[in-house]
Amino acid sequence: MACIDLNADLGEGFGVWRLGDDEAMLRIVTSANVACGFHAGDPAGLLRVCRLAAERGVRIGAQVSYRDLVGFGRRFIDVTADDLLADVVYQIGALQAIAQTAGSAVSYVKPHGALYNTIVTNREQGAAVAAAIQLVDSTLPVLGLAGSTFFDEAARIGLRTVAEAFADRTYRPDGQLISRREPGAVLHDPAVIAQRVVTMVTTGKATAVDGTQLAVTVESICLHGDSPNAIQMATAVRDQLNAAGIDIRAFC
């Protein structure tokens, strides 16, 4: 039986401001990419999300990012490799303490936003992120885009790489994500998104914006929790996967 992990970005509120419905999403996903305070998330909110994840048996991952609260981590920062390494070490360590306090643990690492997109091709920053993870805990898998320089660097130093695809994001013909600034970068129809996910999981193929058929390696599907119909979309994806006989579980 085919199997797939479902992950979502959670803990991205700050103070009284909440982004998305973390509690509802934690009933759907099997892995939670929890913010670490650099692009979003405050300590009390992160502890709350980690406790909910622990209660529901959802695995916790450290969602590391550039130091960019104002831009929500969606702006490129030309940070030095040494500074980026230190920032990533700091973020993982902070979330490790919070997850432990909540009765769980950090089980993997996933870069966020502009950092995620940058290290698809930026080898220096990708190597810095990979090195930081190895220094903290060399057994932590990394979640990201197959074929990226980040994955190359992570594999080179012995880290496990777990390839993900995006439920609601469109792809360029070269397999990279369309920028959120471009029209059509984000899909919104839950039925279309759910069928697209089933196709990716069962056939290993996705359709680029120009109609090109892309080969995709998929061990996990990212469900964005900050879209207006996020819960409806995530529920549709899970229901369609179940209907197709696909086992939904955290990646091993």
From Swiss-Prot:
Any matching Pfam family = LamB_YcsF
GO MF terms, alphabetically ordered:
5-oxoprolinase (ATP-hydrolyzing) activity; ATP binding
In Gene Ontology terms, what is a biological process of this protein?
A: carbohydrate metabolic process
Q: Which reaction does it catalyse?
A: 5-oxo-L-proline + ATP + 2 H2O = L-glutamate + ADP + phosphate + H(+)
The UniProt keyword set, sorted, is:
ATP-binding, Hydrolase, Nucleotide-binding
Q: What is its EC number?
A: 3.5.2.9
- Database matches in InterPro entries: Glyco_hydro/deAcase_b/a-brl, LamB/YcsF/PxpA-like
Instruction: Read off the NCBIfam families from this record.
Output: PRK05406.1-3, PRK05406.1-5
**Similarity field:** Belongs to the LamB/PxpA family.
Instruction: Summarize the subunit comment.
Output: Forms a complex composed of PxpA, PxpB and PxpC.
Please name the HAMAP family in this protein's record. PxpA (MF_00691)
**Per its database record, what is this protein's job?**
Catalyzes the cleavage of 5-oxoproline to form L-glutamate coupled to the hydrolysis of ATP to ADP and inorganic phosphate.
Indicate what this protein is called per its UniProt record: 5-oxoprolinase subunit A
List the source organism.
Answer: Mycobacterium leprae (strain TN)
